[in-house]
A protein has these predicted regions:
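Bacterial N-terminal signal peptides
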Residues: 9-18
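Sec/Tat signal peptide C-region and signal peptidase I cleavage site
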Residues: 19-23
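A generic "folded-domain core" signal
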Residues: 24-196
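Bacterial N-terminal signal peptides that target proteins for export
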Residues: 1-9
């Protein structure tokens, strides 16, 4: 009895799968039901950020405006040990007062302990401490005035360590690596874009 039942079961299974395959073939959709996609316009529109160039670990990011020259900044995202983006460093051309030649913003998470401030140490040089200026929806901002000495150390350095403290763990500093690979070329491109 078992052999007969398994034979009929196998035959029934084969017939059902064959019927399903025929039904699937009969109901196969026509090619015109599928989209081949459209090419998106790669030209940025007003108010969009776009990448003007990449220099090592730095990106020259610009904002499309109605001006003859779009404002740009040199940007790098810094990541935690697990690879998650944590903070942004963006360098901006400024109207120099003779001492400060460039301005940078370091944007950290809202949960940053502001009273501990932020430190930046390029390679084995002495660290500098900077206050946070304000917080906004996307994070808290420390505004960094870069002197000629600072710019020279960025150009000749390999990396900077940026240290901040989470409010939830005020005794556990978060140290982020800012790569200086490509900084010299990126800074030159930023200043060239600002002058044009």
């Amino acid at each position: 009895m078992f052999k007969v039942t398994s034979y009929f079961g196998a035959l029934l299974s084969l017939l059902l799968s064959n019927t399903a395959l025929q039904a699937q073939t009969a109901q196969m959709p026509a090619a015109e039901e599928f989209s081949t996609g459209e090419v998106l316009n790669s030209t940025p529109v007003m108010g969009d950020y776009y990448v003007k160039g990449t220099f090592g670990d730095w990106t020259l990011r610009c904002l499309k405006t109605e001006q003859a020259q779009d404002p740009c900044q040199l940007v790098q995202l810094m990541h935690s040990a697990d690879g998650s983006p944590v903070a942004e460093y963006n360098l901006n051309p400024i109207q120099s007062d003779g001492l400060v030649l460039a301005g940078a913003n370091v944007i950290t998470p809202l949960e940053t302990l502001l009273t501990q401030q932020l430190t930046i140490q390029v390679d084995d040089q002495n660290a500098k401490i900077y206050p946070f200026a304000f917080c906004m929806q996307m994070g808290c901002v420390a505004r960094i005035g870069l002197t000629q000495e600072d710019l020279d150390s960025y150009r000749s350095g390999a990396q900077a360590i940026i240290t901040m403290f989470p409010a939830a763990a005020p005794t556990q500093p978060e140290r982020l690596t800012l790569s200086l690979k490509g900084f010299t070329a990126g800074h030159a491109a930023l200043m060239g874009a600002a002058e044009n």
